[in-house]
UniProtKB/Swiss-Prot annotation:
Motif 'HIGH' region: where in chain: 58-68
Protein name per its UniProtKB record: Isoleucine--tRNA ligase
Family matches, as Pfam families: Anticodon_1, tRNA-synt_1, zf-FPG_IleRS
Amino-acid positions noted as binding L-isoleucyl-5'-AMP in the UniProt annotation, renumbered to this chain: E563
Family matches, as PANTHER family: ISOLEUCINE--TRNA LIGASE, MITOCHONDRIAL, SOLEUCYL-TRNA SYNTHETASE
Swiss-Prot/TrEMBL cofactor(s): Zn(2+)
Organism phylogeny: Bacteria, Pseudomonadati, Pseudomonadota, Gammaproteobacteria, Chromatiales
Species whose genome carries this gene: Halorhodospira halophila (strain DSM 244 / SL1)
Gene: ileS
Entry GO terms, CC: cytosol
Amino acid sequence: MSEYKHTLNLPHTEFPMRARLAEREPQRLQRWEEEDLYGAIRRARAGRERFILHDGPPYANGDIHIGHAVNKILKDIIVKARTLDGYDAPYIPGWDCHGLPIEHKVEEQAGKPGAELTYAQFRERCRAFAAEQVEGQRQDFKRLGVLGDWERPYLTMDYATEAGILRALARIFEGGHVTQGFKPVHWCADCGSALAEAEVEYEERTSPAVDVRFAVVDELALQQRVLLEGEGVQAGTASVVIWTTTPWTLPANRAVAVHPELEYVVVALDHSERLVLAAELLEATLQRAGVECYEVVGRCRGADLEGLSLQHPFLDRQVPVVLGEHVTTDGGTGCVHTAPGHGQEDFEVGQCYGLEVTNPVDGAGCFFEDTEHFAGLNVFDANPRVVEVLESRGALFHHEKYRHSYPHCWRHKTPVIFRATPQWFIDLDRHGMRECALAGIEGVRWMPDWGQARIDAMVRGRPDWCISRQRHWGVPIAVFIHRRSGEPHPQTPQHMEAVAARMEHEGLEAWWDLDPAELLGDEAAEYEKVTDILDVWFDSGVTHATVLEQREGLQVPADLYLEGSDQHRGWFQSSLLSSAAIRQAAPYRGVLTHGFTVDEQGHKMSKSRGNVVAPQDVMDRLGADILRLWVASADYSGEIAVSDNILQRTADAYRRMRNTARFLLGNLHGFEPGRDALVAEQLLPLDRWAVARTRALQERIVAAYDRYELHRIYHLLHNFCVVDMGGFYLDVLKDRLYTTPADSRARRSGQTAMYHIAEALVRWLAPILSFTADEIWGHLPGERREPVFTAEWYDGLFPLDDEPAEAAFWDRVMEVRTAVSRELERLRNEKVIGANLDAEVDLYVSSALAEELAPLGDELRFVLITSAARIHAATEAPVDAASATLEDGSEVRIAVAASAHDKCPRCWHRSPDIGASDEHPELCGRCVENVAGSGEYRATA
């Protein structure tokens, strides 16, 4: 063999078999930065139609986790694919830099503001801490292979952005959407501040559930409202019974609500007392209290009870029965304890009836010292005391423990309370803002489509947006309040603009250092500064105004917002509401959501479970491209499973794709497209089929990229590399590439097809396997001055002349080959043959199938990779021939035998004409022709 090795065209490439991604990717990243790759892409797409994916800013605190990696990789894949589409698709990363978590970190490190630090020093420490966090996260995001304007990201703490946030507030203020109010808001005692809707998460909790008697004050008034039954008037006290899981809110009770349309009953218990409750909940209520004997003595509609006076169970005041559409029969008694200071629905009902908004609880979650019975107690610690007081007053009908979903602070994981405080709100129902937001939802493409119904329901049902926080690190609500009336200064929008202009140069201190007289003149003594800051969800929610409107090369609305599915209640919603207030339209054309990462068993990631997968560890061990391929392989519309096993399987799939690329590159050694490529008409039919197959696949891949169906692309790519290429085309092609003369039509035809395939494949891979695609690009033949990321989808592919018929022919050939391969594998396992080329195959088929396969002639053996392949009539099949059924039901009988001929040392085929050449007695006839003649002729394969 050694004397003929030099006559073979063996593959050669500098593209390494071992990727060593963890080692090589950082080197490639450094080159990208040195060459300003992102800038090169921008220059290449200048003037093209834009595609804007707006980055939802991650919070600048801590290392990135696997969820961050999923989000950034998805964005990067989409931006790179849109660039291949020909769009100018800039990517400006951002960070959310204000807020409580950073305050807590700085307090731990340096002390509290107003004590160890001045407020200005504290804010400066917060700014420095956030900058450190941004830098750490930036390096990790870049390491993922995410291309963007990393040197000019947007930070909500940039002076210009802080000024922009205040200007956005001024625009909303000017539109009449900002109000003040003493309203109940979610309050975290540990934070010492109100919480946004998105900062509340629901967890299971056990609470004390109590049924409480509110005694009817006027017996005659009750009788006048009720249709009496049975014995009519009964002896004993009459009470309306409420049920609540927050006994601590009873000191703030101001009414009992009933539904106007529900049926209510008066039920007598052993002639000792009468209870009023919803008919539908009667049995359940009495059953949990262990009451078996009772009699219904009256009925009425809820509306009939309106205005009935009741005695508070332990305070010296009377409260009315009021009507509320929010009352349901899902549980409880159908009579709802109403404390306007401790619940949104209670507050709204209270507004209708002019009820006092009572809040006896301070910011630490403890009752004020003047609160009767419960002074100084924490609200949750007060629950047992409330039960004691109720029992001592004879007002407790029943008491039990109740397991239910309860709101918790997302930071502290502690239960929150509803607490009425003076706050600033964006009023959703003034000037049609809620309707505007709902209309905006209709015009957006939601992916998955269930996102539309989800956010629609949230916007319809949500309360006004509380935008104020009683903290220090954030954009100030730059408003002057009149000391007597409490009203904002009539020139507030103009004042905000003046402060914003200063903020551009001085940052937040522009407000805190401001002497009111500088803006108010002689009026300064009549006004005081607001000391609240803005909710961080406002900061990120107005980036359509502070970033998209202001940054050159961007535009509003953005084409796409892409975040986790929790952002329907977070960033998607805050962006929508603020945009509805400012622009009367949605800030995005499309919204794409992804699920959360879980382990292989579907469990959430947690340190306690030991199932956390850190992206940094994966990149250091396997490389970023493996992480990127894993993200692409997952159906991100649901939960995304990750584990070491899953990542190892991903690495195996990566190797198959890399090996396909390496085979193509190795066999394109010495191929110059401008010199050696054949035109479509000159290619062998098998090669034309391969190019056409690639073209058809490219259409599917590009369409999947456009629909953001990345997991489909992964499966298409994997199947193409493993089945179409590795399992068929390239396997068949090897013999022709290696054995025919270097410049023969047979070889150049195959190389031309491989060149077209490689040009397409590298582009398909580029959005996902960015490091590997860039590496492949550098080894492809032909001159390449621009990086792969500036390329567009390959347009050099071509269809078959008679696409349906020719495609069907090769599909049938592959079916036959698969059937033969199974039989060859069986015989290899049984040691009948050593390799496929040791075998000769006889196929016994119908005349129709024989006619279909006829174009291959003697070249059928090259397709089957056997030393001989013959076709016979089905009737001639020997009894022991194996049988296979094709997709259309036709049968193929297969007889395989070990070849009796010698093996050619050059091509390894066994052939009867070995020794026919005196000059090359070891070689088969075709190898003699390829070595000493003009080269063998191939007609089809």
